[in-house]
């Protein structure tokens, strides 16, 4: 356990994330809770704590600077679609305390776990919903709508377009750059940025695709 804790701290440093004891402890507690529930509910195929830290926690936290950037530009009310076991939103919510995180999934066992994690970690900035996103109609739109392994870009945008603010951004985590998916985006929206993500201790392709309405900015492709 101590080895995994040190790896987490080193990974956070590699990502340029300043983390105190509170943040590190909550991340470790979340990984332990995920593995405990996973024995019964099969929430993830990953069953080793070291892999959870690398492939779930650090992978999710590669998004932190981009949430900060877009949160500053367009607002901090976020929706994570197909949230599964709370990734990437739960790790992000630990650091972005001023953000309003909303997580939605159709699978009851996953939502039950996420609700327990929110209670156990005392996350005051997280709300959880168990329903289909196309049937979800909150009173206010969202500034940022994110997903991690939810669907194609076109489906992601189409299913959530009624939920996004006119100046908002869709943020989709992908493995390889999904060129064909980008080409199939519906009219009126386009890719603003394609950002190559570097996950500490992992040699794997990861990309963040930022999508917006095309009237906001000319679509650009940016690899960093």
Where are these predicted regions, by residue range?
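Class I SAM-dependent transferase core
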Residues: 7-73, 119-121
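Conserved SAM-binding loop of SAM-dependent methyltransferases across substrates and taxa
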Residues: 85-97
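Conserved small/polar residues in nucleotide/adenosyl-binding loops
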Residues: 214-220
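Conserved class I S-adenosyl-L-methionine
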Residues: 75-82
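S-adenosylmethionine
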Residues: 99, 106-212
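Acidic, low-complexity proline/glycine-rich segments
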Residues: 1-5
């Amino acid at each position: 356990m101590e080895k995994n804790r040190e790896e987490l701290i080193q990974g956070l440093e590699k990502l340029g994330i300043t983390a105190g004891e509170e943040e590190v402890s909550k991340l470790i507690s979340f990984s332990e809770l995920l593995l405990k529930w996973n024995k019964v509910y099969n929430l993830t195929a990953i069953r080793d704590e070291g892999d959870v830290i690398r492939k779930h926690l650090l992978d999710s936290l590669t998004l932190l600077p981009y949430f900060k950037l877009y949160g500053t530009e367009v607002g901090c009310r976020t929706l994570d679609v197909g949230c599964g076991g709370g990734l990437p939103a739960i790790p992000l919510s630990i650091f972005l305390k001023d953000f309003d995180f909303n997580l939605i999934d159709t699978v009851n066992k996953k939502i039950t776990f996420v609700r327990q994690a929110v209670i156990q970690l005392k996350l005051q900035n997280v709300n959880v919903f168990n329903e289909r996103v196309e049937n979800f109609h909150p009173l206010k739109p969202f500034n940022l709508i994110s997903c991690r392994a939810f669907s194609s870009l076109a489906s992601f945008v189409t299913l959530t377009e009624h939920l996004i603010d006119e100046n908002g951004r869709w943020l989709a985590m992908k493995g390889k750059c999904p060129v064909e998916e980008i080409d199939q985006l519906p009219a009126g929206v386009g890719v603003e940025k394609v950002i190559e993500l570097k996950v500490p201790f992992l040699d794997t392709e990861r990309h963040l695709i930022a999508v917006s309405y095309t009237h906001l900015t000319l679509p650009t492709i940016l690899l960093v």
